[in-house]
Amino acid sequence: MKTLRIGSGAGYSGDRIEPAVELAEHGELDYLIFECLAERTIALAQQARLSDPDAGYDPLLSERMRRVLPFVGRTAGSRRLRVITNMGAANPLAAAREVRRIAAELGLSGVKVAALTGDDVLAALQTDASRLMDNDMTLASLGDRLISANAYLGAEGIVQALEADADVVITGRVADPSLFLAPQMFEFGWAADDWTLLGRGTLVGHLLECAGQISGGYFADPGFKDVPDLARLGFPLAEVNAAGQATITKVEGSGGRIDTATCTEQLIYEVHDPAAYLTPDVSADFSGVSFQREAENRVQVAGADGRARPETLKVSVGYLDGWIGEGQISYGGPGALARAQLAREVVLERLKLTGVIVEDLRAELIGVDALHGSKLGSRATAEPWEVRLRIAARCVERSEAVRVGNEVETLYTNGPYGGGGATKAVRQVVAVASLFVPRDAVNPVIHLEDSV
């Protein structure tokens, strides 16, 4: 039975490049998938594209392609490696042009590069009266604060690009597991309504999509869940057959671990209802999934199912939501905690005295209460040797946000004593919310060209 080998080259935009190169060179892959779009990433990319029509794709696209394109295509006695990625972000067409340019620069002729567009529905929804799920606002009410609206496409557009013999497929917003499902549908001829097979293929994508998470990265917890050679963490690959049966593994000799424990943790990652994991392709059912150790760093996956796909597509909406002003300062030595607490009280009082207008405010002592607040009960009796005060506020106006960091900085000379390492920053908030649109309102389009 034919076996397809699919590797995960990235779990987010800024992920390491070396493990992907290791997969391309030593993984004997058919497909290398780079999943690089978090929820806010595409909104930030859209801002970049508005400033420069040739920008708006992943900042590491060029470096990644320069490293892996030499392995793409057919080589005597080996599999044909193809690349699929959502690094096109807000500008898949410009990203595809960049890939073709790099291929030419490397002397690689005939590399077929496809761009998948159609996820950008901003123009169609700009005056829409639909309400966002997260805050009950309408798109129309956001006005010029609205910067992006991208529908989550499924696997079918990528399948069409593969049918057109593309070596590299560049997309914008596509559901994460759909990037991995597409090559399975194409290679095995799975029908777009074979829900069981699509559910199994979606499980493979879900397990691989975060790259190093399943091979021990996010899993590692020294003394409880030890992971060997974490600095050389290898990214995962799946061996899949036409029945959707899969084995998760990694390149032999790479760092990390793949076992039933790492697979189980990744299985429940970002899953609300295991029996109804909704994607544009299928409502996947993970409730019967099981893992079995096949050998060291090899785990068999079984038990996924699926039902009919949703009639709507999720749209991720990015909009401007004010400014965050932040200031930090450290205190060390005897009495560090008391001085940091006094500093916090001083800044909070100063913000009131000077009339700084804030929408939300956090004032925390890093190392003491920044993550859990008072929820874990009283703190340990031992005095910390160092504490860092962080005060951050969200403001409507940038000028108000600037004043937050300025007040923290004035602690240098206005007490308490011994503060150091003060920093301040202001950044614009890009918020993300969601809504649903009818499936037929979104029209994916494939653009295909060869490198020179």
How would you name each of these model-derived features?
Residues 1-22:
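N-terminal amphipathic/basic leader segments beginning at the initiator methionine
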Residues 27-45:
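N-terminal glycine-rich anion-binding loops that anchor highly charged ligand groups
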Residues 51-52, 77-90, 169, 388-395:
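Short glycine-rich or small-residue beta-strand-to-loop segments that form or flank ligand, phosphate
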Residues 60, 104-121, 181-222:
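Catalytic or ion-translocation cores adjacent to nucleophile or general acid/base/metal-coordination motifs
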Residues 109-113, 214-226, 274-293, 350-366, ...:
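Flexible, glycine/charged-enriched surface loops at secondary-structure junctions
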Residues 121-171:
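An acidic, phosphate/nucleotide-engaging active-site surface
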Residues 198-305:
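A conserved active-site cap/scaffold subdomain adjacent to cofactor or substrate pockets
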Residues 302-452:
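C-terminal non-catalytic interaction/assembly regions of soluble proteins
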